[in-house]
């Protein structure tokens, strides 16, 4: 099987941008508006996204799809309020002609996106877009892309990221993917397969056949490889799966069982938990030399390690103090410091790509909650709670988390997203039950 992410299929031309870099409800010191991302409530920015114009019916269909994907991406972020196309007073037919800004202002649009799809002689698609500040009439951004027609959704995600960054001042997260565990069948005979999809739930593909149980997939920093656990021949082993070639290999041959693998930020090492003599300790393996270094040596269960973005520290789960808590220590080993002190137990810690938060699962009072805290343990915040929420993973920009929720009984788990302020909880569509998500870095 071959699963090519086709990064090389996408060629981006030089950008043509003019005017401001930000737009939103509140004007800045230069008279330009900006979406203010804060920890409190956010007033979503009204934005108009007409269908991209095109010269042929088939290209027009793709143009409509591109505008719909952009609309859905921005709406799901919680920072934008796309205006219903039925309210539009102007029909965009030529993106080279400035829009009638008064018509867009009259429907309360503060930003406007126009675009065009053009079929090239070699069969490729040329996609162009313009981002406008309706109040000032300034073009904030513009770019053109060339790609094979089958990758039009990729174009839509990249344009969404461009818009998000121009209007918020922060990197987007739409041109990314999620690896997860697809689950099917009755609860007592559940089949679990490794699956890959776009961050919005589209383009699902299955990487394993479901003959063996798979768990805890994680991306490499390059997006090319996935590490995961598989229960083959009765014991869990850690594997590497190459997304582009479909090939896989066992990561070492360890005595006992191995759990919770995760890449280092430079992609050169894998950190994991190995069970030996009834205890589980943390080990790191150099992927080139295959040399393994032990990081912890305690009569406890140390598991679920996660690197800080700069690779200098790790956070992990340990019951060395009685019940599971979160600890931090140098990535090379050494003294571990406990950072979780609330009621209940803490598990599945993961460091934000920004380095500002550690997300976790917290169990207590019959509830499983998803929360975040600062790396020093301060500022603990519960984002969502319920019967069984677990497995947080950060978007590439660190502003959104994905997790899975299992209602119990005969039903199965589903994926959800929530932002770091606890707002905008949304279900992520998947073909079946889904658990153990892991968000990739940006693809571009």
UniProtKB/Swiss-Prot annotation:
Alphabetical list of PANTHER family matching this protein: PROTEIN TOLB, PROTEIN TOLB HOMOLOG
Protein name: Tol-Pal system protein TolB
UniProt keyword terms in alphabetical order: Cell cycle, Cell division, Periplasm, Signal
A single GO cellular-component term on record: periplasmic space
GO biological process, alphabetically ordered: cell division; protein import
SUPFAM superfamilies: TolB, N-terminal domain, Tricorn protease N-terminal domain
Location in the cell: Periplasm
Matches recorded under InterPro entries: 6-blade_b-propeller_TolB-like, PD40, TAT_signal, Tol-Pal_TolB, TolB_N
Gene3D superfamilies in the cross-refs: TolB, C-terminal domain, TolB, N-terminal domain
Signal peptide span: 1-31
Domain of life (superkingdom): Bacteria
Family: Belongs to the TolB family.
Pfam family, one: PD40
Quaternary structure, from the entry: The Tol-Pal system is composed of five core proteins: the inner membrane proteins TolA, TolQ and TolR, the periplasmic protein TolB and the outer membrane protein Pal. They form a network linking the inner and outer membranes and the peptidoglycan layer.
Function summary: Part of the Tol-Pal system, which plays a role in outer membrane invagination during cell division and is important for maintaining outer membrane integrity.
Principal subcellular localization: periplasm
């Amino acid at each position: 099987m071959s699963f090519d992410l086709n990064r090389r299929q996408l060629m981006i031309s030089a950008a043509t941008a003019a005017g401001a870099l930000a737009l939103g409800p509140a004007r800045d010191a230069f008279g330009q508006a900006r979406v203010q991302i804060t920890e409190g409530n956010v007033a979503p920015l009204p934005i108009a996204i007409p269908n991209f114009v095109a010269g042929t019916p088939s290209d027009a269909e793709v143009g409509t799809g591109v505008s719909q994907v952009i609309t859905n991406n921005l709406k799901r972020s919680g920072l934008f309020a796309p205006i219903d196309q039925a309210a539009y007073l102007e029909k965009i037919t030529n993106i080279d002609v400035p829009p009638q800004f008064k018509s867009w202002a009259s429907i309360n649009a503060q930003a406007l996106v126009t675009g065009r799809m053009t079929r090239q002689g070699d069969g490729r698609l040329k996609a162009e877009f313009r981002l406008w500040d309706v109040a000032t009439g300034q073009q904030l951004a513009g770019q053109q892309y060339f790609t094979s027609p089958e990758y039009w959704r990729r174009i839509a995600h990249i344009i969404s990221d461009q818009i998000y960054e121009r209007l918020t001042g922060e990197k987007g997260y739409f041109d990314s993917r999620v690896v997860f565990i697809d689950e099917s069948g009755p609860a007592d005979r559940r089949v679990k397969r490794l699956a890959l999809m776009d961050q919005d739930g589209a383009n699902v593909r299955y990487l394993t056949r479901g003959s063996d149980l798979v768990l805890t997939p994680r991306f490499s920093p390059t997006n090319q490889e996935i590490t995961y656990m598989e229960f083959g021949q009765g014991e869990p082993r850690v594997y590497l799966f190459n997304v582009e070639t479909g090939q896989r290999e066992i990561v070492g041959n360890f005595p006992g069982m191995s759990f919770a693998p995760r890449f280092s930020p430079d992609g050169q090492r894998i950190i994991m938990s190995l069970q030996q003599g009834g205890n589980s300790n943390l080990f790191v393996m150099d992927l080139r030399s295959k040399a393994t270094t032990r990081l912890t040596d305690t009569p406890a269960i140390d598991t679920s390690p996660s690197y800080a973005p700069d690779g200098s520290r790790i956070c992990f789960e340990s019951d060395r103090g009685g019940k599971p808590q979160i600890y931090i220590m140098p990535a090379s080993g050494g003294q571990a410091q406990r950072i979780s002190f609330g009621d209940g137990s803490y598990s599945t810690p993961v460091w934000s790509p920004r380095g500002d938060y550690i997300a976790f699962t917290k169990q207590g009072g019959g509830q499983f909650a998803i929360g975040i805290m600062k790396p020093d343990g301060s500022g603990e915040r519960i984002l969502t709670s319920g019967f069984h929420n677990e497995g947080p993973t950060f978007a590439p920009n660190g502003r959104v988390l994905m997790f899975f929720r299992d209602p119990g009984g005969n039903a199965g788990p589903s994926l959800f997203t929530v932002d770091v302020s606890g707002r905008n909880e949304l279900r992520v569509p998947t073909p079946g039950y889904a658990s153990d998500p892991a968000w990739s870095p940006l693809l571009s």
